Structures are given as structure tokens and as C-alpha cells.
């Protein structure tokens, strides 16, 4: 089952959270859903070179809070905040509501599946060897602490006559385990030979949502188990002895 479904959608509500957090009913739900899609398209288009990983949207009555996770916050903010102010104004004109924009930095882009997939796709578009781009991405992620990485490219790789699939993997990626923290992304690279699909799985370890971590300052203490009493050995009865 883990091979057939989206790795993040498979874990929603268990160890993963939703990227849109609001509640609505009927036609209002449809309207807000389409509005979220348009907002994400606008932000991704305006911040195409800023390395945006994901966009989280939270709604209240007359306010929308948007959190943008990026590897290059300086490009998003701009000189003296001009870029972020321009983007905020464009979003407010589109929605007619007050927008609160939060810019959050990703400190290790090599461990973010979306950014890794976009990097590989960009290199393939620039005619870099797809094998080299995939292998370097896997090695960088493993060097920074990933427990497993898998990269798959499919299409007319290297301008081949027939499309094929090529994979690079290192470590383990347990896609069936719900508590496994797996980051996943899928992008498309547009080349002169057609479109190349890039998929990335990054396994970062296991997460136990119900486990309570104990404070190191207060280690758990248990009462010592008493040693079992030693019994005296009874003398062996001689069966040959006469009564």
C-alpha cells in the first residue's frame, strides 16, 4: 500500500500536518479551496527563484495568514522589505482580505525533498547529466544526516528514442511504516525532447507521536529487585539403603 499512495497524504493526521488549515461548508468550501490554489500559484510564480519549499495557509474571519518556507529568505524579503510588501499587496488585491505573510527559512535545503527535486529538474533542463545530478543529490542528503534517499527520473532521459526510468538510492526508505518521517516531492523538467518527471523520497528517521520524552534531569528510578533466597540443598536419598 505504501508504494501506491502519496507518502505525505498517507501520514496526514498521524505525523504530518495539513498545509491548509481552515473550515468551511458548502459553496464556501469550494470558493476557499480554489482561492488557496490561486494564492499558491501566484506566490510560486513571483518567488520562482527563491527556493520555495511549501506554503501553509490559515484562515480566520477576515484575515489570511500565509507561511512561506524558503531556502533564500533574502530574495523573498528584498531590500528593506520591498519585495515582501509588493507580494503582500498583490495577495490582498486578489483576495480582498488582510494578509499576514510569514517568511520562514529552511536551514538545510539538501534535506528538503521539494528543493532537491527542483534542483535536479533545473540541472536536467540545463543539459547536465541526469545520472550525475541524481547521484550528487543523494550523496549530499546522506552526508547531512538523512537515513535514506531515493531519486527517480522518468522520460526520454538523455534524448533517448524510448522513455525509461532511472533510479538512484542509498540507505533505506520504509514507505509502509506510518511512523517513518518521509519527505516526498514530484516536479517536471521541460526539455527539448519532452517532459522529464523527477520524484524524490528522503527518510529522516522515525517519529513516535504518542511517546512522551523523559527529562534527562529526572531519570526514571525503579526499586531494586531483591535477590532470590537460596535454598539449602537436601541430601540425596540412597535407594539401595535397606529399611
UniProtKB/Swiss-Prot annotation:
UniProt-listed Gene3D superfamilies: 3.30.300.20, Ribosomal protein S3, C-terminal domain
GO MF terms, alphabetically ordered: mRNA binding; rRNA binding; structural constituent of ribosome
Record keywords, A-Z: Ribonucleoprotein, Ribosomal protein, RNA-binding, rRNA-binding
CDD domains: KH-II_30S_S3
GO biological process, one term: translation
Residues annotated as transmembrane: none
Domain of life: Bacteria
Region span, Disordered: 212-243
Residue ranges of every copy of the KH type-2 domain listed in the record: 39-107
Recorded GO CC terms: cytosolic small ribosomal subunit
rRNA-binding keyword on record: yes
NCBIfam families attached to this UniProt entry: rpsC_bact (TIGR01009)
Quaternary organization: Part of the 30S ribosomal subunit. Forms a tight complex with proteins S10 and S14.
PANTHER family in the cross-refs: 30S/40S RIBOSOMAL PROTEIN S3 (PTHR11760), SMALL RIBOSOMAL SUBUNIT PROTEIN US3C (PTHR11760:SF19)
Protein's job: Binds the lower part of the 30S subunit head. Binds mRNA in the 70S ribosome, positioning it for translation.
HAMAP family, per the entry: Ribosomal_uS3_B
Family (UniProt): Belongs to the universal ribosomal protein uS3 family.
Protein name stated in the entry: Small ribosomal subunit protein uS3
Organism: Chloroflexus aurantiacus (strain ATCC 29366 / DSM 635 / J-10-fl)
Gene: rpsC
